[in-house]
Amino acid sequence: MAAALTVASVGLSSCVGDLDVENINPQKTSTTEYDYILNKVYANLVLTGQKGPDGEGDLDDIDEGTSSMIRQLWNANSLTTDEAKCIWGDEGIPEFNRNNWSDAHPMMKALYYRLYFGVTLSNYYLENVKGDDNETLTMRAEARFMRAMFMYYLMDLYGNVPVKTSVSSEATPQSSRSEVFAFVEKELKDIVGDGEGNEVLADKRATYGRADKVAGWILLSRLYLNAEVYTGSAQWQKAKDYADKAIKGGYSLCTEGKNGYSAYQLLFMGDNDTNGAQNEIVLPAIHDGMETQTWGGCLFIIAASNSSSKTDVNLGTSEKWGGNRVTKQFAEKFITDEAAVKDLVEPSEVAKAAGDDRALFSCAKHTISMEDESDFYSGYAYNKFTNIHSDGTQPKHTQFVDTDFPMIRLAEAYLNYAEADARLNGNRCSADGLAKIKDLRKRAHASEPSAFTLEEVCDEWAREFGFECMRRTTLIRFGKFGGDSNYYWQWKGGSVNGKQIDSKYNLFAIPNSVVSETIKQNPGY
């Protein structure tokens, strides 16, 4: 929580014209304030400005409430897929739901600027903090890790983007997706000790919320798992090797429940920094109801998935926005008997009936099929994230949440390993890959299979990582998103039963506000 991450008090803002930081004078910035700037790099995952939920936003000409990185990562990776749809009519939401966005999409513009704001903060820190002592070298490695992660998301979402490594008003030329991949790969390999230089991450974080080698290994594994999409050349063995390093890196799956909550529930609760989940959460985006107030982050995920009008699910916050619910295709990856859950309100009861601790739906008054785009009760609510504290203590704030968002957790290494293993073994997991699947399903009290195919791995990604900003990337990797795919979900392409969408949607449009002679638009937009 916020005790582990002091938010920068230095005046920071961004100019959306050149995406550089203004109002930082190096001659007036103390060493302590540079530490605050590194903290601001981390806080960029959650916060949007200098005054809590709104006021003095980081980004010019962007609605602050829509500029939260996690909120827009979630929208881009959930609403566009078989996971969820939102009933709101806010500009950009219907376009996400129906897969028909343009280069004027306001939320993808906000996310583009938010990610580059993180890159610029990282660059500013790296340009001004020098030294060869171990602490400085490690902190510089952390700033490079965060910059690499921001660049990874830019590459994943937008494809060909500029690689910015300095704070400058000069225009940075556009790089190809393969070139961005090579940059991210080299940066990550350097800072985990597999490349050049002596700026290396700690073997294991000393402070919760800081990046370490395991975070670097998992992000490398993710990078290699998607290498075929990003570069045209598969790198399954490297994905598997770095996943294996991470699995053996000193973290552990959260497998013990507490006070009536399942181990899986603990990962997404208001005290997930102390309840045992912290041993699995490798890199959290830290939240604190008093200190990190935002309309994005985990508050958005929790509040938008709950409503006070018909159901009464206590999720630990007074905010109940009634927006997001899941498609039939997502629910049916857990629910095989609709009649057994149709009258159940509490997600834990649904999970028990479904035989999978991850089936954290609220079903009463809802229909499993999303026939009506505008009705919150058309489609199940998915209440995986909560602000409830497992030890029975009260949240720090009645409105804003304490729940940390797991940007990277160890379970990803298990699924990366299993998927890469299946792809290396004729689309079926070997005994080693199957063991990783069994570990996750055993934790969820789900049936343990005797065999697992690559197609089943795709569904397991949905079960394990629903609402964690993973689904769009997964579907593209499996050839189930844009282009010649026969995998449909409700409202894909604007049809209630789903239909194919153009392959151009495998990338988002570069915001039209930055397209220029040096930054070209993606094909089809």
Protein language model features and the residues they cover:
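Extended ligand-binding clefts on enzyme/binding-domain cores
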Residues: 52, 252-377
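Membrane-proximal, proline-rich intrinsically disordered regions
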Residues: 15-69, 518-525
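Bacterial Sec-type N-terminal signal peptides, specifically the leucine/valine-rich hydrophobic h-region
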Residues: 9-12
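Short, surface-exposed recognition loops and adjoining beta-strand edges that mediate ligand/DNA contacts
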Residues: 25-32, 51-78, 161, 167, ...
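Long, intrinsically disordered, low-complexity segments
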Residues: 15-16, 31, 85-86, 115-116, ...
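Conserved, well-structured interaction surfaces
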Residues: 31, 35, 39, 43-49, ...
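Flexible, polar/acidic helix-loop-strand segments at domain edges
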Residues: 88-110, 331-409
